Curated annotation (Swiss-Prot):
Glycosylation-annotated residues: N90, N120, N181, N333
Tissue: Expressed in roots, stems, leaves and panicles.
UniProt cross-references to PANTHER family, sorted A to Z: POLYGALACTURONASE 1 BETA-LIKE PROTEIN 2 (PTHR31458:SF2)
Residue ranges annotated for the BURP domain, each copy included: 128-341
Protein known as: BURP domain-containing protein 16
Keyword terms, alphabetized: Glycoprotein, Signal
Keyword Glycoprotein on entry: yes
Signal peptide region: 1-25
Amino acid sequence: MATSFLFSLILLLITALSLPFPLHASSVDPLSAGATTVRYWNRKIPNNAPHPDFFLSLLSPLPASVSSSLSSPLSISPSICRSARLLCPNSTYFQSLSSTVFIDGCTFSYSCTFTYEHTNITIKPGIFFREQELKEGNVVRMPDIANELTTARSSFLPRSIADRIPFKAEAVKSLFGLEPNTTLAKAVDETVAQCQSSPSKGETKRCVTSAEDMIDFAVAMLGDDIVVRSTVLPNGPGESIMIGKVKGINGGKITSSVSCHEYLFPYMVYYCHSVPKIRVYEAEILSVQTKEKINSGVAICHIDTSAWNAGHPAFVALGGKPGQNKVCHWIFNGSMTWVIADKS
């Protein structure tokens, strides 16, 4: 019996390792946990909006049957870690990972401040800007929007597995065998601490550990006629770019959104928070030299910053105090924002 179960599990893992990287909903294996998520999306958001590639790429490649086959108590073996496209602690990626890569998620929390080894952190030029800078023909500094975390192609766990893992730092480190004081162990500590911190005034937040959890939160905050947007390609980072055509989503009216930012964790975790009183823009990003389009960017402008922490990186970069100025930033490659479907 045990031999038969082990053989079946090995076959499932081989299948998972051979699954194609998803690009379109139709290409997601119908027996995978990712396909289950696509069907869940269609039930919860019935507006026939396309499923963007950047979201599909995060879905679990595991066959749906694997999650029900895992033993109890749950254990994550190296083979499961690889086949589920998780960030395994013994991978080459983690040996070269910078100790500060996971700070960017905090950057977009209202309450974020330099509290965790941030003393010598340099804020990326162009990461924050004024709303008036987002104008066709302007030449601005584009920050490095290529999120280092996305290079590892990590995935969400199936919800049935993620829900079985206590969202506690010691439990996660034990489950994944993380050594103390390693980059990943420190990131787990920081992520859990940020997720468990109290929300700022006017903010509703949730750290989501599955794609279904993210969908639920976005629908709860905005309703079911929504779409998710992100910067399309990581072109133009760290250099001056020209702003092309700019479109205000929903006519540029003040609205609300749910923004989600990736945290460094053994499996995919996003810090999602409701963002009231914002304007969302889509902008063409052009080469200064050729004037040719090299990217499509999504930017959010926060109209009311009165509830933000006075030590927030935006005020360090732009000056001013909470409530004095509007603050805009690009949605980084790897982050995303959910908004009400555009009617304009």
